[in-house]
Structures are given as structure tokens and as C-alpha cells.
């Protein structure tokens, strides 16, 4: 009965083949985030910003400024000079930083953080900032290895008498035959390599490669000459390797300095019970010492001088940078002058505000107003920055953004409803207008309509208040709260 029930959803094709639908666990759903539509800065070849390109609408001057910044980044001429994005909330500062990361590509490290992330009870604030700096600095290691690659045609271990035992025998060496399109070669390998071959479960007909320096063995797959050997087999078939059996391969590995820090900050303890228990009890985050980082920097410098590695400065994006305090700003000033410094992009939506960490004058812990500065940043850090201002979106730009988000989210909407959402975005904020999109699609679907109408948007406007209307409601109830 269970078999009949499970096959009820199967589809019978005209050819007579029964196809089963894929299980739900294998179906991939693409999540739609706030900035899913951003694919780049949307610049022309001459560096001018197009009105609507690569998912970006508006912010012409800011995009052109970031385009110049991008040219300096790619030319390696912009270290130590951070970029500061300032503007009201909801004007696309985070979207600009993400577009910059899209333009740089996946090979360039991009580390995004929020200013409030530095406050932790386990790790110092400067340590959190330092680890983010190291995450944004990549190291491209190029290594040339000599390997033997081919299809296994012979695998013969040779035994010899064990001198330590009167009866047992040991493996003295192993004969391995490898075949490629160009020729064959027979290798005589050490017994330790035979152990690696056994761990990989290599048999005749498998395609393997053996590193000449380390003796490491890697099974690539089964030769496609044996593909018709079985009707059903959970095996990956690969073609016969081309070229000679003995060849040189250039391997490129991309790591960050933070990866090297973590690999060296966690030494492997002993295998006794006390070491194991100590590793289990020890919790929290590992703090990397400055001494260890200096040693790693020396090794990295040596690799760069030898031509083995190449330094790839990435981008560190600190959103809500006004949430940092004076200690963090002092650390930032020093870190920006370091020769191993990434490109730093800051963002703030504050005007003249108090610098965090300056509210106390130090006299018996008494509070003071603190130091007020533009964007909540010290003047010495502001002097280092190149500042880019973002503008509020116009009604036409809000309308085009709403239309684009409807296409991304797959929501059918009428032109009148788009105009209504554009009015709401101009009156309150762009975020409020975009937040009404998905609920409006659900409301219209529940009503059995094919597209979102003006009535659906008005209904949601009554259900969900924007920030301005909510503040107005609170002001109207102040007298009531004072009386009771």
C-alpha cells in the first residue's frame, strides 16, 4: 500500500518512462533579500552613471564617485584613505557598498560589519576590529607541484620478510602503473604511499594523481572506459588524463590573513584525557596576540619577496560607524597607516552628534555632554576620509525602484498601485513603501485578484503605520499619559 501511495504523484511520460518529482529537500529556493537586485554600480565605459543599470536607480553623483574610487582600488593607489558615505537613512549607502563589492568580484575579499559588533564580553573591541581588518586582506599563494597523474593499470605490492618478526611479512615497495593519452609509466613507490593508496581505496581502473614532494595520493574518479561495466553504480567517471604521466601543476589558493591567524592561534593539544577535557571546557572566541600576527606578517613578507604569494587588499565596510567609540577610532587611525591595510569604506546617517566614549569627563565618573562632531566621528579621522553624500530619492526614482522590486519578487501590480506606493515612499520613506509590497501581494492573492490594486495598498496603510504616523499617535497620547 505504501508503494502505491508513494507512486501516486509520479508522472507517466508518453514514452512509458515514469518520472518521480524531486524530494522537497533537494529543491532550492532563492531567498530574496533587500539588495538582491543590486548587481553593480551601473556605470558606462567612460565612468558616468546610467540612470538605471545593474539594479541601481538614482544616486548619480555617489555612483560616479565610487566608480573613481573603484579605479583607484584596482590600480592599488588608494591604501590608507577611507571613503565615508553620509546621508539620511534609506538613501542607499549599504547598497553602494554592496555594489562596490560586486564590481570587485569574488576573488577580492569583502568584509562587512556594523559598528556595534565590536562590543563583546569575551574579546576586546580593538581585537574585533583587528580581525575584521585581517579578514579584508587576501593572500594569493601560487605553488607549482610535480605530480604523477593517470589511470591505474597495475597495482602490485611487493612483500619482504619482516626482520623484527620471524613469521610476518611487510610491504617493501609497491609497483603502480599509470596511463594517460600520451603514454604509460611504471612507478616504484614507498610503503608509506601504499598506505595512502589503501585509504583512498584505489583499484585498477581509477584515475589518481600522486604529489612527488609529499607522496599524497588523491583519487579523482573512475576512468570512463569502465562506464558500461555496470548498469547502476554510484561512481563518478572522469576522462583519461591528457599529456604525460609526470607533469607540473600550478595551484592557486586564496586565503585571508585572518585564516592564517586562526590556523596558528589554535595549536593542537595532546591526546591525553586532560588535554581533551581542557579543549571541551574552554569556550568563547580565540584572541590572537600581536606577537603572533607580527610573526605571520614576517612569513607573508618573505613569501611575497620570493614571488610565492601575492597580497590582495580587499574592502572593509563598516556600517553605522558612529557607533564606535574613541578607543576604536584611535585604533582605526593607526591601522589605516599600516602597510598591510585594506581599503576601508565607512557609512553614517548622523549629522552633528556626540562621539561615543566622550560622555564622561573623568571626575568621579560624572557625566558630561561629550564632544560633538560631524557624523559622530573625530576630526582627525574625518580629515583622512573622502566623503561622498547620498541624496534623498525623488518620487520618480521611488516609482522605478518599486517597479524593479516587483519584478524581483514576482508580484503583479497595477500602475495605479505603483503610483500609490511611490506617494507613500515620498511621504514617509522608501523602506516603508518596499515593505508593503510582499503583504500587498498576499492580500491580493487571498482576495483572488490577479494583481495588486490601490485598495490593497490603502488597506495595508491602515494596518501598518509608518514612523511619522506612529510618532504622531504617540504625541496625541502624551496628555493622556500625564493625567493617569
UniProtKB/Swiss-Prot annotation:
Its EC number is 3.6.4.12. It is found in: Nucleus. It catalyses: ATP + H2O = ADP + phosphate + H(+). ATP binds at residues 87-94. Keywords: Activator, ATP-binding, Chromatin regulator, DNA damage, DNA repair, Helicase, Hydrolase, Nucleotide-binding, Nucleus, Transcription, Transcription regulation. It comes from the Eukaryota. It is an enzyme of class 3 (hydrolase). CDD domains: AAA. Gene3D superfamilies: 1.10.8.60, P-loop containing nucleotide triphosphate hydrolases, RuvB-like helicase, domain II. Residues 1-27 are annotated as: Disordered. Residues 1-11 have a biased composition (Low complexity). It holds the Pfam family TIP49_C. One of its GO terms (cellular component) is Ino80 complex. GO terms for molecular function: 3'-5' DNA helicase activity; 5'-3' DNA helicase activity; ATP binding; ATP hydrolysis activity; DNA helicase activity. GO terms for biological process: box C/D snoRNP assembly; chromatin remodeling; DNA repair; regulation of transcription by RNA polymerase II. DNA helicase which participates in several chromatin remodeling complexes, including the SWR1 and the INO80 complexes. The SWR1 complex mediates the ATP-dependent exchange of histone H2A for the H2A variant HZT1 leading to transcriptional regulation of selected genes by chromatin remodeling. The INO80 complex remodels chromatin by shifting nucleosomes and is involved in DNA repair. Also involved in pre-rRNA processing. Belongs to the RuvB family. May form heterododecamers with RVB2. Component of the SWR1 chromatin remodeling complex, the INO80 chromatin remodeling complex, and of the R2TP complex. This is RuvB-like helicase 1. The lineage of its organism: Eukaryota, Fungi, Dikarya, Basidiomycota, Agaricomycotina.
